[in-house]
Amino acid sequence: PMNYFSCGRPIRQFFGEEDIFNSRCPELRNLKYKMTAKDLSNRVTSFLMKLPFAIRQVQFNLFDSHDVPRLHNNPAITKDAYKGAVIMLFTLPGCTNMYYGDEAEIDGRITSNEGCRYPMPWDKNIEETSSWNLYSTLAKIKTTSPAFKDGGFKVLWDKDYIFAFARFTQDELWLSVCSSDSENRTIELPIDIFGNNFSCVPECDVFGEKLNAKYKDGKMILEVPAGKSFFIKVE
C-alpha cells in the first residue's frame, strides 16, 4: 500500500501544509498546528519499528499522487521546503515513488484531484529545471549506494523544527538534515557512533551547498540556517 502514514502525510505537514486527512474534514480543517521535529520523528520511527527489515525496505514511499495535490503546486511551500521534502522522500527507508512530472516542475492546482493530473510537459526543457537536478542526483545515490539498499537508519536530531537522520553501512555514512524552522539553529550530530572512519566533515553537501560545520568530540557541529536542508556524505 501507499505509505502515506509515515512518509507522505508527516513530510507534507512538517514542511508547512495541514495534514491531508485533517484538511478533508470540516471539523478539523481550521485547526492550525506546526509539526515539530519530535512529532515527525515519533511518527516515522513508531511505524518503522513495527516492521521487519525486509518489509521496511520496500515501503511505497510517496508524498504526491493522483489523489493528492502536488506539493510544489502549493504557493505556501517554498523552494527550500520542497527540497527538504524531496531529500526526506528519497532517504527514508523504503522505495521512493516519483510521481510523474514532479521532476519537470509540472503545472497544476491544489483545489481538486484533477489539478494533480495535468499532462506531462514534453515540450519543456525538463533537464534544465532545478527539480530535475534534485531528483536525478538523489535517484542515482538511492539506486547505487549500499546504505540505501541494505543499510541502517538512525535518528540523530529531532529538536525544535530540525529532523536529522543517518543512513549507513560499515563503509558509508549519509546524513539528511531537514529544517522547517524559522530560526537559525546549531545542531550536534554524534557521528562517532558509526566508527572512527567517519570524522572528515565535508565543505559542501551533495548539492554543492556550503556547510558551516566542524568535527569536535565525536560530533559534527552544524549551523543550519532557517528553513534550509542538507544531504551530506561523511567520509
Annotate each language-model stretch with its function.
Residues 177-181:
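Asparagine-centered strand-capping/turn motif at beta-strand->loop junctions
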Residues 202-219:
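Solvent-exposed beta-strand/loop surfaces of large extracellular or lumenal domains
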Residues 60-62, 90-91, 96-100, 176:
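Structural recognition of the beta-strand scaffold that forms the well-ordered cores
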Residues 150-172:
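Surface beta-strand/loop "capping" patches
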Residues 214-235:
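C-terminal beta-strand-rich structural cap/linker in extracellular carbohydrate-active enzymes
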